[in-house]
């Protein structure tokens, strides 16, 4: 389903530029300056509206995160949601940004000045994840999260799947040794396909289940907005964790 275009989406994203870093290489190379710490960097491919990354970054505070989303009108929702969760303000009625001190920064203004505020351990990027990741240095990432990606069900589209062997080889290169991939999907066909691809790859599957919400792993599971909706409709969630053995 195509998402309705967000009113003033580009302008809203621009106001929160402090939380956006579309140059993933710069983020990796200057992570200590950007995050003000030396914690390992993790990546979420396809962050959607940001429920997962918002909660994951709270649960695992000793990591930094880059949340990548291809669709700008989806990513702006995630950025705003995260900013509000950090106490940095909220969306103003006119589409501008209302800071925590109640100052209104209207649309068309320069980016919101968050100097002195703690921006937390997440930055966002809009663009094609594969293109961004292909430019990253070897062994520069601690973990990758792939939640409910497009299954590309049509015949002949297998190579577009984010768990196709060529993607797994890319992930292996940029992940540290023993770095992990966390993969969730409601699509059984995609999951079985992914299990086969991982077996051909440098990764070792250390955990898998066809019913995440009935497993012990559910105790620490953080739901995405998509996952919550489809679980309520009776869909079972498949999950695997794979470790990089390059």
Give the positions of each predicted feature.
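A short acidic, Gly/Pro-enriched loop at the edge of an enzyme's catalytic core
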Residues: 134-143
